[in-house]
Amino acid sequence: IMYDCCSGSCSGYTGRC
């Protein structure tokens, strides 16, 4: 599962913006 982490506030996951 990829999370949208633009600000980097997703449990340390680096997803696509």
From Swiss-Prot:
GO molecular function terms attached to this record: acetylcholine receptor inhibitor activity; toxin activity
Cellular component GO terms, alphabetical: extracellular region; host cell postsynaptic membrane
Keyword Secreted tagged: yes
Keyword terms of this UniProt record: Acetylcholine receptor inhibiting toxin, Amidation, Disulfide bond, Neurotoxin, Oxidation, Postsynaptic neurotoxin, Secreted, Toxin
Subcellular localization: Secreted
Cystine residue pairs: C5-C10, C6-C17
Main localisation: secreted
Modified residues (Cysteine amide): C17
Entry annotated with the keyword Aminoacyl-tRNA synthetase: no
Tissue: Expressed by the venom duct.
Residues modified to Methionine sulfoxide: M2
Family, as annotated: Belongs to the conotoxin A superfamily.
Comment, domains: The cysteine framework is I (CC-C-C). Alpha3/5 pattern.
Role of this protein: Alpha-conotoxins act on postsynaptic membranes, they bind to the nicotinic acetylcholine receptors (nAChR) and thus inhibit them.
Listed name of the protein: Alpha-conotoxin-like Sm1.4
Organism per entry: Conus stercusmuscarum (Fly-specked cone)
